[in-house]
Amino acid sequence: MYAGTDDPWQLSTRWYEQRKYAITLALLPHRRYRHAFEPGCSIGALTELLAQRCDQVTAVDVADAALRTADARLRDAGLRGQVTLERSSLDDAWPPGPFDLLVLSEVAYYLETGTLAAVLRRECRGLRPGATVVAAHWRHAVADYPLTGDEAHAVIAQTPGLTPLGCYRDSDVVIEVFDNGDGQSVAAREEVPGAC
C-alpha cells in the first residue's frame, strides 16, 4: 500500500481528514492528557496533533513504511521525543501504560465483532481511572473490512465500564467519546453554573 506513496489515504492533505481530526480533538473533554495510546497510527498525522495535547503518546501500526513516515513527520515537528512508535496491532497485547487517553481512529473496523469486543474488554480495564476513549470511523461499508464504522462503534459502546460523553455523526464519519469514570460533562467538571 505504501510502495507508491508515503500517504496513500491523503491523511495530510485531504480536507475530510483535517476536519475529522479537528472534530475529534474538539470532542476530547480534557485540555491535556498524560499518556495517550493510538493503535493504527498510520503515518502519524493524528499522532502529531495528539502530541501537542499529551505529555506522552504511544502509537503503533502494523506497517513499517507507515511507522517510518510517522517517525520523520514527528521529527520534523520537533515532537519525536514524546512519542513512542512501535510495530504492533490493535489486537496484540497493548504496551504498558497506564493510558488516560485511548484513540481508536479508523482502526476498529479491521477486527471481527468478537475479537474487537474481547480486546476492548481485556485492555480497557488497564486504562487510568477517568480515562477518555475517543473513536472515529468511516461509516460506509468497505469490502475488505469486517465491520462498518457504525458496527465498530456499537461494539465499543458495549465495552464494560465505558460511559458515553458525546458524539458527532454525519453521512461519512462517526466520532464518539467515552470515559471510564463518572461521565461528567466538561462544563460540570469546570463547575460552570447550571451544569449537571
Task: Give the label of every model feature segment.
Residues 1-39, 43-97, 111-125, 131-196:
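Class I (Rossmann-like) S-adenosyl-L-methionine-dependent methyltransferase catalytic domain
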Residues 103:
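A conserved beta-strand element that flanks and buttresses the S-adenosyl-L-methionine
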Residues 107:
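Hydrophobic adenine-recognition pocket in adenosine-nucleotide-binding enzymes
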